Amino acid sequence: MAKKTTKKTYLLLFRGGLDPVEMTPDQMKTTYNNWMTWMGQLKKNKQLTVGHPLEDDGKMLSGMKGKDVASFEDDKDTIGGYMVISAKNFAEATRISKGCPIFNNGGTVELREAAEM
């Protein structure tokens, strides 16, 4: 009987990179195709759980009553998207993350393991 490998859940937070309004049509097409290829491969390998870009508008809330403390409109360090993946361990999740197309445009990936609850 084969031993079942338990996969762990990881969150990838995408920040920065070129703003789409600063890209040429060719850059936008290449970037889009790179993302679709990468995500398609993750889906094929059953590693992609969910992932979406985020809209530009948003608010940072704080305190007991959720007071508005910030807007994201001009913040270049704002999270622009996220992805949830499954991997055997942190090393595999890191390897997967290193293939992210955001690096081609100067962006970053924050990789976090989800805690068991």
Regions found by a protein language model. Give the residues of each.
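Conserved, structured core segments of small domains
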Residues: 1-117
